[in-house]
């Protein structure tokens, strides 16, 4: 199986960092393009006023930009074609939507993210993507 387009959801966790490393190795082997993707969610994060909420949105966007910029620099240093994007929403829905619309051949993602809730083997986002994605999903521990 050849993977020309690989989607790599990132959240800044150790597991997503390992997924990035694995995707770089796969991209080298298959001469693939990587698409680095971050989803932030502010569900239940409404502040006491609009100004606080706007500040929270800006922080989430800034964090997403930072995660993507660092990962993009790493990928480019390996001579791999890369694109980046971030969006707001439900992580599972947005990752699956992006994978379908972009017609990706593979999703490479970390086993667990930044959530404080620990699942036994994999996180709820990873599990949701596995169940709903149309392409293969590689989970990296």
Identify the residue ranges that each predicted region occupies.
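Structural beta-alpha unit
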Residues: 1, 73-107
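Small/aliphatic-rich secondary-structure junction motif
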Residues: 2-50, 74, 78
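Histidine-centered beta-alpha loop that forms part of the nucleotide-sugar donor binding/catalytic region
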Residues: 11, 89, 111-114
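Gly/Ser-rich helix-loop-strand patches that form or flank binding pockets
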Residues: 25, 97-141
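Short glycine/serine/threonine/alanine-rich loop segments
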Residues: 32-33, 80, 104, 135
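Conserved beta-strand positions in the Rossmann-like core of class I SAM-dependent methyltransferases
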Residues: 35, 83, 138
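Generic structural signal for helix capping and beta-alpha/helix-loop junctions
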Residues: 44, 92-94, 116
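A short acidic, glycine-rich active-site loop
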Residues: 53-66
């Amino acid at each position: 199986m050849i993977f020309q387009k690989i989607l790599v959801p990132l959240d800044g966790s150790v597991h997503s960092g390992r997924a990035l490393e694995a995707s770089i190795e796969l991209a080298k082997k298959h001469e693939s393009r990587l698409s680095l993707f971050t989803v932030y969610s502010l569900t239940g994060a409404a502040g006491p006023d609009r100004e606080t909420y706007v500040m929270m949105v800006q922080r989430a966007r800034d964090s997403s930009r930072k995660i993507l910029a660092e990962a993009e620099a790493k990928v480019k240093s390996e001579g791999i074609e890369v694109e980046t994007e971030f969006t707001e929403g439900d992580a599972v829905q947005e990752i699956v939507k992006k994978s379908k619309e972009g017609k990706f051949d593979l999703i490479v993602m970390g086993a667990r993210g930044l959530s404080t809730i620990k699942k036994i083997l994999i996180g709820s986002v990873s599990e949701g993507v596995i169940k709903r994605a149309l392409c293969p999903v590689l989970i990296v521990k």
